[in-house]
Amino acid sequence: MKGRIELGDVTPHNIKQLKRLNQVIFPVSYNDKFYKDVLEVGELAKLAYFNDIAVGAVCCRVDHSQNQKRLYIMTLGCLAPYRRLGIGTKMLNHVLNICEKDGTFDNIYLHVQISNESAIDFYQKFGFEIIETKKNYYKRIEPADAHVLQKSLRSPCAPPAGELQKAD
């Protein structure tokens, strides 16, 4: 299947499309606050189009936890018939490029259901590592446990941004 993959903004006009995609793709449902917040994150939320058909989406938020600036991937998914066509790669690269351009993120992370081997493989190809497993992370789905996958965006020897010493 040859096709054109494009990313587009999430707007009040197409947020229902995002909602429908998420309902089909993910085993968990997201509340209205999730969608309200998604409209505020700008480039961190994108719909993915395959030949002008909305087939997937990525939604992230900035998270300040563990004394770090982290990017959290809330959702990244694509309808089953359109998988393995490079759409997920395009969405993840979009997010990684934002982090790279910004230059102040310590890492990027997400939760993946422990049984979702294809997602785990996908993220590991991009240098994500399983850093912990959260018991009973999900409600009402089995298995309820989630792996936390994380990709470090700084070399361990680099000082955190804003702490670079100025030469006199």
UniProtKB/Swiss-Prot annotation:
Quaternary structure annotation from Swiss-Prot or TrEMBL: Interacts with naa35.
InterPro entries in UniProt: Acyl_CoA_acyltransferase, GNAT_dom, N-term/lysine_N-AcTrnsfr
Binding positions (CoA): 116-125
Gene Ontology molecular-function annotations: histone H4 acetyltransferase activity; protein N-terminal-methionine acetyltransferase activity; protein-lysine-acetyltransferase activity; protein-N-terminal amino-acid acetyltransferase activity
Predominant place of localization: cytoplasm
E.C. no: 2.3.1.258, 2.3.1.-
N-acetyltransferase domain residues: 5-154
Organism: Danio rerio (Zebrafish)
Biological role: N-alpha-acetyltransferase that acetylates the N-terminus of proteins that retain their initiating methionine. Has a broad substrate specificity: able to acetylate the initiator methionine of most peptides, except for those with a proline in second position. Also displays N-epsilon-acetyltransferase activity by mediating acetylation of the side chain of specific lysines on proteins. The relevance of N-epsilon-acetyltransferase activity is however unclear. Required for sister chromatid cohesion during mitosis by promoting binding of CDCA5/sororin to cohesin.
Protein name, UniProt field: N-alpha-acetyltransferase 50
